Amino acid sequence: MNSIFTEENLLAFTTAARFGSFSKAAEELGLTTSAISYTIKRMETGLDVVLFTRSTRSIELTESGRYFFRKATDLLNDFYAIKRRIDTISQGIEARVRICINQLLYTPKHTARLLQVLKKQFPTCQITVTTEVYNGVWDAIINNQANIAIGAPDTLLDGGGIDYTEIGAIRWAFAIAPDHPLAFVPEPIAESQLRLYPNIMVEDTAHTINKKVGWLLHGQESILVPDFNTKCQCQILGEGIGFLPDYMVREAMTQSLLVTRQIHNPRQDSRMLLATQHSATGQVTQWIKKQFAPNGILTGIYQDLLHREN
């Protein structure tokens, strides 16, 4: 019974079903027609069903045969997928890589480009992408929810087992709607004026380590939103104030949706790190690390988001 489900048997059966002919299946597989016919007959005997109705000129799947064809095709696909995975693993290519991207560096365009180059380079690797805010990125890699973190914030944490290297920095701009009252206040704007308006904030997504607050004045109201795109839209509508990544502000300013203003004690650049598990030595991880070096492919993809020192 077990011999029925060999690769050779399943391939003979599915090929015969696709061509509707034992002779054409034999020609396709480089076998004799009698060998194909014998294999199918042995499978029918083992399964105790008729897989094909036969005529002098053609064969046709029975209802049981159609069901078995679907399952046999799935089994062959699984077999070939497993074989490809084993081959790649033996070459040091990870079967699966989980990437956590800091929301400051997450855009659909950049993430799609990242996946495009990774799948071109490593087509058999299963890639999962998630996004977190601030220390939520560290949380993901420390708790083994991610193998690689793109944009871990510049915070040194205890725990060990993590390698990291700088990939650039996010530069911040204080941005408000053109008709916001603060747009008409002399610069640099005093903190006493800033406190009068709510700060639109994206909450840190860390669960097991301390959450980080990006920028908030003492006594200032805060409005929490889930992501920086929502924060940007809220500030465009004049619902609050705050710092945004400069790349996001530049785009909004081209449409006259935001203006920038100078304030006392502006927010400093946020250094971004590429962090990996120390034990992650596979080819995908090493390739990503290499391509975030100067002139690397991934450095080029993220160059409009990150500032790098020359």
Swiss-Prot record:
Q: Which GO terms fall under biological process for this protein?
A: regulation of DNA-templated transcription
Residues in the DNA-binding region annotation: 22-42
Which terms are listed as keywords in the entry?
DNA-binding, Transcription, Transcription regulation
Against PANTHER family, the record matches this protein to:
HTH-TYPE TRANSCRIPTIONAL REGULATOR (PTHR30126), LYSR FAMILY TRANSCRIPTIONAL REGULATOR (PTHR30126:SF18)
- Record's protein name: Uncharacterized HTH-type transcriptional regulator YahB
Concerning its family, UniProt says: Belongs to the LysR transcriptional regulatory family.
GO MF, one term, reads: DNA-binding transcription factor activity
Pfam families in the cross-refs: HTH_1, LysR_substrate
Q: What is the lineage of its organism?
A: Bacteria, Pseudomonadati, Pseudomonadota, Gammaproteobacteria, Enterobacterales
Which SUPFAM superfamilies would you find in this protein's record? Periplasmic binding protein-like II, Winged helix' DNA-binding domain
The residue ranges of the HTH lysR-type domain are 5-62
Task: Kindly give the Gene3D superfamilies that the UniProt entry links to this protein.
Answer: 3.40.190.290, Winged helix-like DNA-binding domain superfamily/Winged helix DNA-binding domain
Superkingdom in the source lineage: Bacteria
The organism is Escherichia coli (strain K12)
